[in-house]
Amino acid sequence: MIKLTFNLIKGLDYKKLDKNYQAKLDEIFSQLKNKKTPSANMLGWIDYVDQDHTKIYKSIDNKITEWDKLKVTDVVVIGIGGSFTGIKAILDVVAYLPSEQKRQIHFIRSLSENSFLKILEEVKDKNWGIVVISKSGTTLEPSVGFKLFREALYKQYGEQAQKRIVAITDPKKGVLHDIAVKNKYEMLPIYSDIGGRFSTITPSGLLVAGLVGADYKQLIEGAKKAKADLFASSELKKNSAYTYAALRHYLYTEMKKDVEIAITYEEQHEYLMLQHRQLFGESEGKSLNSLFPTYSVFTTDLHSMGQLYQDGKKIFFETVFSFEKANKNKLKLKNSEFNNDDQLDYLTKKSVNQLNYVACEATKQAHASAGVPIIEIDVKENSAYGFGYLYFWLCVATSVSALLLGHDPYNQPGVENYKQRMFKLL
């Protein structure tokens, strides 16, 4: 499902990589398999994919059917961090074109008043509902968003608004849990042993994917396959996620590359790059010892950052993502109807996708010639199944990479720092 290529890393000795890392990777493999990592109580994402999801699927299908009967056309999804980025990444893969979207999704994912006003204006004359995602119900951003949008929903629908709210939260306790129980809102679980950035294909992502009309169950099937593949062996030659983690560590510690730039040539996959940034940034950004993950969308960013990437200080490496079935070569250029005044007839019969592919190949050659190490990650399916596979693959790679650095992949003390200071100021 995933092909990892790294022949554009000059000076890499694969035998040395294997010799230096295999024993460490074997140890990490055992830690993950036997739940012996730091914060081992947060490893629920590993076994979650193999659990019986029948009850959750039924609840999701029932809610979709109910909202179909109510003719709900728009959904406000309220969440932040892992409760936003991953869900948006799913939607952009499974329902990117307007014709693929059964419902319009609006995200509340910050404390931007203008964003709140914009979305309130967008839904005020629509038939809409709310999905609110918060484990505790006390995180300020989603709490404030839910307060404002719940008031607007009740103002429009009165007591009928109760059927138009789904709370995804801790199934046993918390402010949002108590609100849902009190008002008899549909409630789906956030699992206490799965952190936000590792929760994309739990009910929060599954429900929203289902609401737009995607085959959301395939997200789990793809992740199941990834687990079977990645927990079979820790050998570098057999485990691409472990190889990727080792390459990142090698480039950072041995080749002194401090920045990783995740790159896509499809705007459709920008939020996948953001998800990559969150997974690695939040899991590894500790103790003043980590790669700095960022991303670019090409060819757009070639016209803003391309100069820096080509001729700037080489403190970075690139990880280029591609999806084999992302494009269907539907848009082909024809002979000009205006006497070739645009001078593009030499491109006749070529598709826009082919042009994008050539741009990708040319850029890789140019950057590699300038000494930029390049890792390539090719995913075979641009689908719910493919997303599920890639997401689980990234979760494994993130965990291994953080553990190689000696970090706890599953905590985020720096985030808690700002929260404490914010509440103190309020």
Swiss-Prot record:
The keyword Ligase does not apply. GO terms for molecular function: carbohydrate derivative binding; glucose-6-phosphate isomerase activity; monosaccharide binding. Keywords: Cytoplasm, Gluconeogenesis, Glycolysis, Isomerase. The active site is at 282 (proton donor), 303, 419. Pathway: Carbohydrate biosynthesis; gluconeogenesis; Carbohydrate degradation; glycolysis; D-glyceraldehyde 3-phosphate and glycerone phosphate from D-glucose: step 2/4. The keyword Isomerase applies. It catalyses: alpha-D-glucose 6-phosphate = beta-D-fructose 6-phosphate. CDD domains: SIS_PGI_1. Gene3D superfamilies: Glucose-6-phosphate isomerase like protein, domain 1 (3.40.50.10490). PROSITE patterns: P_GLUCOSE_ISOMERASE_1, P_GLUCOSE_ISOMERASE_2, P_GLUCOSE_ISOMERASE_3. It is found in: Cytoplasm. GO terms for biological process: gluconeogenesis; glucose 6-phosphate metabolic process; glycolytic process. Catalyzes the reversible isomerization of glucose-6-phosphate to fructose-6-phosphate. This is Glucose-6-phosphate isomerase.
